[in-house]
């Protein structure tokens, strides 16, 4: 019986890999040199509650190791789910999603955000601190710490369907959230600040947002209540991005909105052929305004539906976002479990992963993918992780450029040389000097080409590693085969320097 099960497992995996290769070839999938490959690691579902410090660190380290093997190069780590903190904060209380009790510090003490920054950077990954801006209490939180903003300033929150929401119509709430963001940006070496889809609450039939008083007092001359709500969120997004870049220009500010901007209907031309909740009309989030005005540095619409969904077809939506949200880098939020669950419409023996990745490759303004959620990829649901590491994300990828922040390439590496050491044959180089943050070298890219092969740095299959180290161990065999190694520098915005070549016999 066990033997038969193992044979079935092997056959199923082989079939999936065959489907991946078939679809990739048939739909024109090619590896990308620059691609954002992210994953969300959330706390809000309680996956860490009850874990000791050691157990949580082991769990996170294992997830990061597996995601690194899958080719992931960025992590969105949730550090603020309900005006709380998974980091040391003098502004907000420790999260119950960390210790089980809001306001209780972890024992033995540690700072999860600082630890994750170190662990991600060690693995060559970016770390984006993920915050929920307005939610002050989730449905299942029954007790708030006295330090919590809803306890200290109850008039600044409103209840809605079991939630507490920081009222977006109050300037002091906007300033408060930005104060929290500034504190993180100042004290931590993060690569980005990330905010998800929760702005005004998702609408519930029969419930009204209780903001009559705030609208009457602070309408700013806006006669339409919906426009006023959008104005409140717009001002927050604009001011938050400006505050981040004043402190650290290289810290990226991004959002992951709900997957539908607006449903197309008479009077709404810039809408998709969908029938669902809308950012603009229901959540009061004018995402296209933020993108087109440059108030955010990247956008990750959450396209969690399948191809062929009757109300929110994935193909329709990814093509819509590709068309309308190209003013800033566009990454697509993917639901791993749903993608693995649904069969491809044209090839029912395969799930929808190959078809979706083919769309990513074909659409010119799609610059990356973010996986919802990390653990699903780590658990290899539907062999999703296997397909990433063996096919789609097999080769390392640089981050997409952000020339609106910095477009100047750094200086190339210096003193590239190969040396025999007690640890083997090592390729060494040194970091060039820098006078300013946008000149500073942050990482290096190492390429390898065989003898006679054209040096083409646009070919990602030639990337050996992307590293912050100033050396690379060479795979010496017998010294009979000739290669050309190429080393380049990267700055914080992934601008790439000129190349330095070194011919070697391995």
Give the ranges of each region predicted by the language model.
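Beta-strand-rich modules
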Residues: 473-497
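Aromatic-lined carbohydrate-binding/catalytic grooves of carbohydrate-active enzymes
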Residues: 71-107
């Amino acid at each position: 019986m066990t033997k038969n099960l193992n044979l079935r497992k092997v056959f199923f995996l082989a079939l999936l890999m065959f489907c991946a290769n078939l679809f990739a070839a048939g739909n024109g999938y090619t590896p990308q040199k620059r691609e954002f490959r992210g994953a969300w690691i959330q706390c809000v579902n309680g996956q860490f509650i009850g874990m000791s410090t050691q157990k949580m660190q082991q769990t996170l380290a294992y997830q990061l190791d597996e995601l690194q093997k899958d080719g992931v190069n960025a992590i969105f780590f949730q550090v603020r789910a309900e005006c709380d903190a998974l980091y040391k904060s003098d502004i907000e209380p420790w999260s119950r999603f960390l210790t089980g009790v809001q306001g209780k510090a972890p024992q033995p003490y540690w700072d999860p955000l600082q630890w994750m920054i170190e662990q991600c950077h060690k693995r060559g990954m970016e770390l984006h601190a993920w915050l929920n801006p307005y939610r002050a209490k989730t449905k299942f939180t029954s007790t708030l710490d006295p330090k919590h903003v809803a306890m200290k300033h109850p008039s600044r929150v409103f209840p809605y369907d079991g939630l507490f929401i920081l009222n977006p119509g109050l300037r002091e709430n906007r300033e408060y959230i930005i104060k929290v963001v500034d504190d993180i940006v100042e004290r931590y070496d993060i690569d980005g600040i990330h905010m998800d889809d929760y702005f005004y609450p998702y609408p519930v039939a029969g419930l009204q947002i209780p903001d009559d008083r705030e609208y009457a007092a602070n309408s700013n001359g806006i006669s339409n209540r919906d426009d006023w709500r959008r104005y409140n969120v717009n001002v927050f997004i604009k001011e938050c991005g400006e505050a981040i870049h004043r402190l650290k220009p290289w810290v990226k500010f991004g959002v992951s909105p709900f997957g539908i901007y607006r449903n197309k209907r008479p009077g709404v031309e810039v809408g998709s052929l969908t029938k669902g909740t809308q950012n603009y009309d229901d959540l009061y989030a004018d995402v296209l305004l933020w993108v087109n005005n440059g108030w955010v540095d990247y956008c990750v619409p959450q396209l969690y539906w399948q191809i062929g969904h009757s109300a929110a077809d994935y193909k329709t939506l990814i093509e819509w976002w590709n068309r309308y949200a190209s003013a800033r880098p566009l990454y697509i939020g993917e639901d791993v479990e749903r993608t693995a669950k649904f069969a491809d419409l044209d090839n029912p023996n395969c799930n929808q992963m190959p078809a979706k990745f083919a769309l990513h490759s074909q659409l010119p303004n799609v610059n990356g993918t973010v996986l919802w959620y990390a653990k699903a990829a780590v658990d290899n649901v539907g062999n999703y992780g296997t397909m990433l590491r063996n096919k789609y994300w097999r080769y390392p990828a640089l981050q997409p450029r952000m020339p609106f922040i910095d477009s100047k390439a750094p200086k190339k590496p210096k003193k590239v040389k190969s040396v025999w050491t007690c640890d083997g044959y090592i390729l060494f180089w040194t970091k060039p000097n820098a006078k300013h943050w946008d000149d500073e070298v942050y990482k290096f890219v190492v390429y390898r080409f065989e003898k006679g092969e054209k040096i083409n740095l646009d070919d990602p299959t030639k990337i050996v590693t992307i590293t912050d180290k100033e050396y690379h161990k060479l795979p010496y065999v017998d010294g009979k085969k000739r290669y050309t190694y190429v080393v380049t520098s990267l700055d914080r915005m992934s601008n790439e320097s000129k190349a330095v070549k070194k011919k070697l016999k391995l």
